[in-house]
Amino acid sequence: MDEGVNTYEQLRVEGRENPNAGLLKDLAKSKQAVSALGLENLPASALNQLPYQVMASRGLDQPVQGPTAGQYGKGNYGVIVYYKTAALLRYLAGYLGQEKFDDAMRAYYTKWQFRHPYPEDMEAVFEESTGQKLDWFFREMLTNTREYNADIFATQTIGDQVKVLVRTDSPVLWPVPVSTVDAQGKVLQTLWTPPFGNPEDDAESQLNFRKENVAAVVVDAEYLTPQLNRRDDRLALGDGNFRRWEPVRVQPLASVERWDRSAINWMPVIGANTSDKFMLGAAFYNGLLAPKSCSTWPCPCTASAGTSSTASPRST
């Protein structure tokens, strides 16, 4: 874990000068790339999770703790040991609060400087410093490759409060950050659930927010958690069948998972056969960077022979 701790601290220091500090900081400098990939207004935490999400969505994820250096797959050593670990530590800091996290890190350094501690030693110091049980993080999240997911199950407005019911299908405990946002998507208030989860069924937790200026409630608005699916993270207040509707943008090549909008990607395609000769068209798809369990690639094409056209859909 030492590489991941170093990466976490490095990103914090670099972030003071560059808000986009991280693995893809050069990408964020290009306005063309930012627009093409739909990265506008995304925090660095979202970009730093992208390499891990690419691997995990293809079934190539590995635990932070457990494998030896030689047991990590091709490309996974840097992605998992450095950046996944750093991202999970940022998530823990969000849950504990930055001040409590920093106090625990100082206590850890003071006790174990010039020695070789193990993850259980770090857990013991953090639990003593914060007064909280953190086995859900050190013994579960760092040692497994589970796909964590949570959504907003229901909201109820009573007086000047918005009561929010958060749901997770995780079989193990984990805390979930939930935020209220205004009509422009600005975060108004963020609260964390206690660690919750159930191996037998969905688990639920209730949070109470201030009502003023709230347009929607969002799971993980700051992209701290290791979720892969962001499509069910937002629920607008009010009634109707479109409370989970997100704006859809058509973008070339690829896009990242966001809670505030969906994307349909496209790329040019060419083909040929004996009947239609040369064909030119476009493929439309979603989830190239983080593939879904079910996806469809419709490919409308125009043939050079005659005026007919053909479509070649592909589903997986």
Annotate the PLM regions.
Residues 1-169, 173, 183-186, 217:
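Hydrophobic alpha-helical and helix-loop surface patches within well-folded domains
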Residues 130-132, 213, 289-290:
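Alpha-helix capping and inter-helical loop/turn segments
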Residues 162, 183, 196, 212-216, ...:
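Cleavable N-terminal export/targeting peptides
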Residues 170-173, 211-212, 275:
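Short proline/glycine-enriched turn/loop motifs at strand-loop junctions of beta-rich domains
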Residues 177-179:
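Beta-strand signatures of extracellular beta-sandwich domains
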Residues 188-198:
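Solvent-exposed serine/threonine-rich low-complexity stretches and specific carbohydrate-binding patches
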Residues 200-211:
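Exposed aromatic-hydrophobic patches
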Residues 207-209, 220-316:
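Outer-membrane beta-barrel initiation region
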